[in-house]
Design a protein with these regions (language model features):
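Outer-membrane beta-barrel proteins
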Residues: 17-25, 141-147, 333
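Extracellular beta-strand scaffolds
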Residues: 66-67, 188
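Small-residue helix/turn framework positions
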Residues: 1-16, 30-42, 65, 79-140, ...
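Flexible, surface-exposed loop regions and adjacent strand-edge segments
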Residues: 50-53, 116-121, 171-175, 210, ...
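Structural motif
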Residues: 62-64, 183-184, 255, 295, ...
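Extended terminal
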Residues: 22, 239-241, 254, 277-283, ...
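Anion-recognition interface
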Residues: 59
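Long, charged amphipathic helices and adjacent flexible linkers at domain junctions
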Residues: 360-373, 446-456
Length: 539
């Protein structure tokens, strides 16, 4: 009583003693009771809990325990009414309990402050949450007065036109309405919930899946969000080949170190501007799921895009580029690597390089720090049919590995096998070293069409980078043409071919050449020597 009742004015009171006056009388032979009628009292139920002030009520101290009947009071800025406080007498060897029931009407912010600050084990779960708006409900508290025992708390409340700001992940809910319950033995639950998120209406329910000492809350929401609004929320500034409205089901699990966010969507209404087979019109749809953890020094990320792609990643909080992960293209599962960087693997039936090159130029061409290249650690692909630069390769294996100052590409296919060295230095030549290149045989039954379109007509020679090319064996059908080597260098007008050394079935073409002009209106030239040994072998 001395610590619980901090102040107050007593309107009236009485002391009652009933029983034996004998000194050696049994305790059961006596009955002592006190009564106070108070106003403007301030009560402190337990350390760590906010005080209840402006209390008007009655206090009964009896053999059975202590009772307080408060008609009204104030907890923070919340009005409380019809509060019944009971501290029943505890038998020998048992702990005393403080039992409180009552109603309240106030603000959502007060409710969050109690969840954050009161000694009930919910501070970390609701840390950083903010709220405003009307809140009304009732509470039922069972607070042990002995140290080391957790209180039992059940609070039922309603909100209407409230605003709730979650801290992790950062999410702003407005026009929040619903029926909620907080149970300290399970967690937060709710039903009939509606709100606005990402400027769109949503419906939601909250499930309490925890147990005493281990609270767990799941928030399940359904709604729609524009791609632009979602990328802003995720703080993605890089343009993406995605547009439209995303229908989603969002699930946030608040479970301490196991807290995570999951977003699933049919993607119906979303247009994906990617080359086949990954692109799709807005009318098609493709089941996709994104998950991420919300706690811990290292955050985990997962994403699945139908049966076409799977992604997993782990990175320190707020340091995505220091992470490690894998993107698997095709029907398979990504595996988290131990080394830093993003690894790409895949098994694809077809891949056309040209549209992917245009896509990279469009969306990554303005990457000032080259962050995508810095993050990539390697790639390993198997492609049934690879098309690019006017050529088709079959049964292709591609491996991309990081070197100190360059990327190393290994190519193995039916038509070509070798390595490509892609230097970091801008303008440095790309080194192409091929063991063999197999060109299709000329069909003698097919007559050349002089009016056939030029396959190089649409190529701008000024866009071709510096290249050092060496081919050990060049075949045309089953016939060996010879070894080829040359150096290609960009010029103001187009390209220069230097150090030409081309084997042509017994002849050797050496010298220099050039290719200049605009697409469709270009010209080429050559200056050099043509040598041969035995003319019979050549013919």
């Amino acid at each position: 009583m001395r610590t619980a009742i901090l102040k107050g004015a007593v309107d009236q009171g009485f002391f009652q003693y009933q029983g034996s006056l004998n000194h050696d009388a049994l305790p059961a032979a006596r009955n002592i009771s006190l009564f106070f009628k108070v106003h403007d009292a301030e009560l402190a139920f337990q350390p760590g809990w906010p005080h209840v002030s402006k209390v008007n009520g009655e206090v009964f101290v009896e053999e059975s325990g202590v009772r307080i009947l408060a008609s009204k009071g104030q907890l923070l800025d919340t009005k409380v009414k019809d509060v019944y406080v009971n501290i029943p007498h505890a038998p020998a060897g048992k702990d005393s309990h403080l039992l409180i029931t009552g109603g309240f009407a106030g603000g959502l912010g007060d409710g969050l402050k109690i969840l954050q600050d009161a000694p009930i084990g919910t501070g970390s779960t609701f840390a950083g949450w903010k709220g405003e708006g009307d809140l009304q409900g009732k509470l039922d508290l069972d607070i042990p007065l002995a140290k080391g025992t957790e209180p039992k708390i059940v609070v039922d409340f309603k909100t209407d036109k409230a605003r709730l700001q979650l801290a992790e992940p950062t999410l702003d809910l407005t026009q929040l309405k619903g029926d909620f319950r907080f149970d300290s033995a399970k967690g937060l639950s709710g039903q009939n919930i509606s709100a606005k998120a990402f400027d769109r209406p949503i419906t939601a329910q909250i499930l309490a899946d925890g147990k005493p000492g281990s609270l767990s809350t799941r928030v399940i929401a359904k709604g729609q969000v524009t791609v632009k609004r979602l990328t802003d929320w995720l703080k993605i500034s890089q343009p993406l080949p995605v547009s439209g409205d995303i229908p989603y089901q969002l699930q946030v699990t608040l479970d301490g170190a196991d807290s995570q966010l999951m977003v699933s969507s049919t993607m119906k209404g979303v247009a994906v501007d990617l080359p086949a087979p990954f692109g799709m019109p807005a009318s098609q749809g493709r089941d996709s799921v994104f998950r991420m953890t919300l706690q811990g020094a290292e955050r985990r990320y997962w994403f699945s895009y139908g049966e076409l792609a799977s992604f997993t990643f782990a990175a320190p909080a707020d340091k995505f580029n220091d992470g490690r992960g894998e993107l698997f293209l095709g029907n398979g599962d990504a595996v988290l690597p131990a080394a830093k960087g993003l690894r790409i693997r895949g098994v694809l039936s077809e891949l056309d390089i040209d549209p992917w090159k245009k896509l990279v130029d469009r969306y990554a061409g303005n990457d000032p720090g080259g962050s995508a290249k810095q993050l990539l650690s390697g790639a390993d692909f198997k492609v049934g049919k690879l098309t690019g630069f006017g050529t088709q390769f079959d049964q292709v294996t591609l491996q991309l590995d990081r070197k100190p100052t360059a990327w190393g590409l290994q190519l193995d296919s039916q038509q070509a096998k070798g390595t490509v060295n892609l230097p970091d230095a801008k303008g440095a030549p790309i080194a192409i070293n091929l063991q063999y290149v197999k060109l299709p045989a000329v069909d003698p039954t097919v007559q050349a069409d002089e009016n056939a379109p030029d396959p190089l007509a649409d190529i701008d020679p000024k866009e071709i980078p510096a290249l050092d090319i060496a081919i050990n064996q060049l075949f045309q059908g089953p016939d060996l043409v010879g070894a080829w080597s040359l150096k290609i260098r960009p010029t103001a007008k187009g390209l220069a071919f230097n150090n030409l050394d081309l084997g042509l079935k017994g002849m050797q073409l050496k010298g220099a050449g050039g290719w200049e002009g605009a697409p469709g209106a270009s010209s080429s030239w050559y200056r050099g020597r043509l040598d041969g040994k035995n003319i019979a072998d050549v013919l």
